[in-house]
Amino acid sequence: AKVAGEPFETELPASTYQATPMPKAIKDISKSKVMVITDGGLVPKGTPDKIVGMAATTWGTYDIKGRDHLEGEDYEISHGGYDQRFVEEDPNRLVPLDALRELEEEGAIGELHNEFISTSGLGNPLSNTRRMGREMVEKVRAEGVDAVILTST
């Protein structure tokens, strides 16, 4: 009907979402505490928080204090939606600890928080992601973090 220029009604109406207000801009990132959050499912070997690779209901925080680089043998991926080989080979491709430590050393960022947050974002109902997002925001605020770098797949 649409191609012929006739009236039609879609079978799949577009979803509408509540607008999320934009946070205030960071005035000086060189004085800010920065944290990494990923929905790419990077977790320590053994998946200590039992984050599942699809429709995850949990998230975890993982210590990076005193580390300059993430090693592939220490981590695994709990996410079924992408080719994991490149991240398994070098987890810094998803959680760029090496690059962020360089920026911290140069003074480009004030401080890198000593943990990162991870979950799997694959096939997740909006109710789950909203709840987990609120929980993560509480954690970020409680830790005094000023800025978050969100990495995805």
Model-derived regions, located:
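Metallocofactor- and cofactor-centric catalytic cores in central/energy metabolism, strongly enriched
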Residues: 1-153
